[in-house]
Amino acid sequence: MLILLDQNGVLADFEHAFIDAWRKRHPDIEPVAFEDRKSFHIREDYAPELRGLAEAIYTAPGFIRDLPPVPGAIEAFRELLALGMDVRICSSPLMQFENYVAEKYLWVERHLGREATQRLILTRDKTLVQGDLLIDDRPVITGAARPRWRHIIYDAPYNRDQTDRPRLDWRNWRNVLAGELYRSDA
């Protein structure tokens, strides 16, 4: 089984690192709490006059490279490989890619090892990537093709209105994926 894992928000803890960076840069302005997030795009949860400040954080050199892992993500990645799954990291860089692309590779190398960089797929359109499952925090994924993979939502406050697909986090991933493996054998 080919499992595609999104990077930011699934493997790399973008959300909490953003809040920490916001507090350091703008101690006089309260950040939007993670549990209060409504939009997949973090800048859209801020007032228009604050969106440039938000964007300056996540496009800053070193931000993506220095993201901490989501708790349990590294262990789950390694366990899936040990179970014989073909696991790939499928990530969409921002349009402001100057730092993003290299830093995504550096993040993978730092947390998963240099060999894992060969498992990194960067694309603006995930529907063009083949796989059996895509675990992604983006609530709706559209593109040029009808995807072959089944979208499993990685749980986040901004995607909880989507109830038509399986949902997981790194605490319950074994149960959710066991159901998907059974389903694929049927």
UniProtKB/Swiss-Prot annotation:
One of its GO terms (biological process) is pyrimidine deoxyribonucleotide catabolic process. Its EC number is 3.1.3.-. Its cofactor is Mg(2+). GO terms for molecular function: 5'-nucleotidase activity; metal ion binding. It comes from the Bacteria. Keywords: Hydrolase, Magnesium, Metal-binding. Pfam families: NT5C (PF06941). Dephosphorylates the 5' and 2'(3')-phosphates of deoxyribonucleotides. Belongs to the 5'(3')-deoxyribonucleotidase family. PANTHER family: 5'(3')-DEOXYRIBONUCLEOTIDASE (PTHR16504:SF4). This is Putative 5'(3')-deoxyribonucleotidase.
